[in-house]
Amino acid sequence: MQYITLNNDVKMPAEGLGTFLMSPADAEMATLNALRAGFRHIDTANGYYNEAGVARGIRRSGVPREQIFVSTKLWPSGYTRAAEHIDKTLARMGLDYIDMLILHQPCGDYLAAWKAMEEAYKAGKIRALGLSNFPEAKIAEVIEAAEVKPQLVTVENHPYHPNDALREYLSKYGIVIEAWYPLGHGDASLRNEPVFAKLAEKYGKSPVQVILRWHIQKGNSIIPGSKSPAHLADNLDIFDFALTDDEMAEIAKLAEPGKTYYTADESVYEKYLSIPDDFDVQEAKYQEELRAEILAASDEYWKAQFDLDVDQLRKTTDPKAPFVHMGITMDRGAEEEAIAQRHIVTVKRDDKHVDVRVIDDEIAIILRQLELTALVGGNEAINPFVATETYHRQADGSWKLISFVYTHIMPEHYQFRFLSK
């Protein structure tokens, strides 16, 4: 990995993972896959609503925190309470510090927010400061008012829109450009340019890798987004070749003044400012969805057990058939003892209380107080139980049962009654 030394001597990986438009679950898996692939820079934002997901991916990766460069952004509707939102961001991500904190949009009281960021910087909560989507005039305004100058400006940047005038201005202050949309947005027009096909063939790379290499040689930081382990590996495989000066000049011919994919005006900024600054709302929704996902895995397990028992239970209609308890076959003479010992063949579950807990992002435990109803020898028995199920998250994000323990409780409440025939 190549590193960029910022104007405050902090070292930042030249390439990182962008998580724009990713759900908390997708951001978690993308972060995990990226760190396993060798990435050491992860970018998120308050306004992406996935910071907690990124944090889970970081924890699950096992990569030491000091080896990871985490950047995030404050949303403008929170600028007036920037100090509070800085602390909330740290708490949301479970971090002691943020490597790069960025003002996301050039609207609202960004000068007051910058002052709050400077105080957090001095307190060691932030290692570097940046601006996002700010035009040159507003960057100059921040620089003029700032005690701590920006280290980075993240803007739309790609061969169609290299932003060379802004680059020249920022170079006076040693400010690095970080490119979002480094591949020219979601369409394929940029990567289908013939020059990239030609250079890809020459270097044994893909057009995407050639474009990302162009950014590196321009001095840009880049944060392409991907959830695919294969694409992540490809995006990182750009540091073993270099484009010549003539090739860089040929790519420069693609630049078209005004060819951008993103524009914003005051009406857009007004919408940004109207967005509520409750950035935990999607995480709360994700936790609800995660709980439902784990319970669905549990229901599949219980259903499989019930299907097995009910199928086997049908055999008890034949007096010569063996007695079956939870998939275990016993001789017919054991039936009365099974009833006496309050063993059951479950046919119905009635949950009284269910608690789902996720531990260390990869282990889920379901604590369940329930009643199990059995039909034994034509009779119905109802037993109260406490069950503990433990699930492990697999590489594909699914949950696998790894242990199941149930304990019979309150035997004085045991019910056994004859059914009418």
Where are these regions (language model features)?
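N-terminal binding-site loop/beta-alpha segment at the start of enzyme catalytic domains
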Residues: 1-68, 183
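Acidic-and-aromatic substrate-binding clefts and catalytic sites of carbohydrate-active enzymes
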Residues: 22-25, 45-53, 75-81, 106-111, ...
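Short, acidic/polar
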Residues: 22-34, 78-93, 139
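A structural motif
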Residues: 39, 95-98, 126, 150, ...
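A short, structured active-site edge motif that brings together acidic residues
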Residues: 65-78, 99-106, 133, 354
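CE4/NodB-like, metal-dependent polysaccharide N-deacetylase domain
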Residues: 83-103, 119-123
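Beta/alpha (TIM)-barrel catalytic core signal, keyed to glycine-rich beta->alpha loops juxtaposed to Asp/Glu
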Residues: 105-281
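A beta-strand edge to alpha-helix "cap/lid" segment located at domain peripheries
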Residues: 283-289, 293-315, 320-421
